[in-house]
Amino acid sequence: MDTAELAYPGLAKDPKVDLERADPDLESQEYGSHLTAAYATSLSDTVGRQIETETFNTIKYRTCSWQKTAALLFSEYICLAIMSFPWSFSVLGLVPGVILTVTVGIIVLYTSLTIWRFCLRYPEIRDVCDIGQKLFGNSKIVWYLTAIMFLLNNTFIQSLHCLVGAEYLNTMSSHAACTMAFSFTMAAVSFLFSLPRTFSGLSKLATLSAIATFISVLLATVFAAVEDHPRNWDPKKGNPTFLLFPASDTTFVQGLGAFLNISFTFIGQITLPSFIAEMKEPKDFWKSLTAVTIAEIIVFTLVGAIIYVYVGNEYMTAPAFGSLGDELYMKISFSFMVPTLIFLGVLYASVSARFIFFRIFEGTRHKGNHTVMGWASWCGILMGLWVLAWIIAEAIPFFTDLLSIIGAVFGSFFGFIFWGVAYIYMSYADYGPVFYKKQGLRGWVELVLNVTVILIGLFFLGPGTYASVESVVQSYQEGGVGTAFTCANNGIRS
């Protein structure tokens, strides 16, 4: 099947059809054919013009193949968060854990394909902020609100990777230095790796990150299966046991927290428009997306289930590296995670930096050429982002719980609500207010599906935020909240 037909079912064979020829009074299928051909032509023309404008630039942005884009996606999704899936399964039970992992993966794939279709229709879109503006009445206010959420989301992910970098260094060195120093070191190293100006330039690092992470989780899974006992094994507790379904005393907050943990690992659609905007052939993005999603579902499910079965409810930690009984096993498997500890923060820093940089230097020679002003500004923006990320990570004593709140609020929009609305927006533009009738059975099914997607987003925004806030309250009550700018050990076995 032609890729444009995947994006726009019923693609017309006449490439010269334009929007003016699309008569709403035509039969639905013929009308859709006229429209899809028009959008396909518009995409080709716009991308061609963008590539042509870069012909004499020394820095070319539309250079990513679908393979390089797949590497970026693999590095974004195949990450440390995988090692928290065993904990989620221990809370939810094996059967619900597997079902929810597969279900969330499929829903995120569907919404990501909606993003792809939207970007093909409107190839001038550069990032999620442009989409937000277009979806909600072309409002500049919505653009600014989306930009604030976009930058906060990305910066908080950078902050998280400052902390997990410090966690790794503390674990390996037995807390040989102040945690603040370790997290600052992580920020400094990440700044250096953030310097490439294009996603194509980052793709090799992304490939290394994804491969190393896969090795890390594979080793951890094998080690959990072959060692005699997990860490803190106690003969009085007995051997590890696992449950097919949640324990009877599992609370709503605990169960929802485990579900959110699974969902947050899948939700990464915020970067997709930025990736598509730098592809040579945006119509090939579905290949990258499908390959990564299949790998995600398989890896997340197997790692979560296998480690949970061998570690059990009694000895589970998050991340699951801490459950390995042999310290050497733990250090070896955790060490292969280093590239992703660095690169995932780098990727989000790069997405934020180009968002700012492009808007400052759009239409100038500094954007596409090696100029002192261009490079000084690029480095300055990145440095500012990493310094801010480090300060946030160290200044907020309940940062991890705050990240859950941010994830629930922002994930509701960037993971679900935006893309349900995007489907309705495109269908309304093509077929009018009764689009679901004109599209037949498919129209009704997709309408129900996308309304469900929006409702899931609202669930994240409401109960999801409540569960995250309640987690912060419980941490305070249990004395689990530390202090700001602390040197305290945050290693896995501190």
Task: Locate predicted features.
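Non-cytosolic membrane-interface motifs at loop->transmembrane helix junctions
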Residues: 405-409
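Residue-level detector of conserved, function-critical positions
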Residues: 400
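Short Gly/Pro-enriched loop/turn and capping motifs at secondary-structure junctions
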Residues: 397, 410
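Intrinsically disordered, low-complexity regions flanking or connecting the multi-pass transmembrane cores
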Residues: 1-394, 404, 414-494
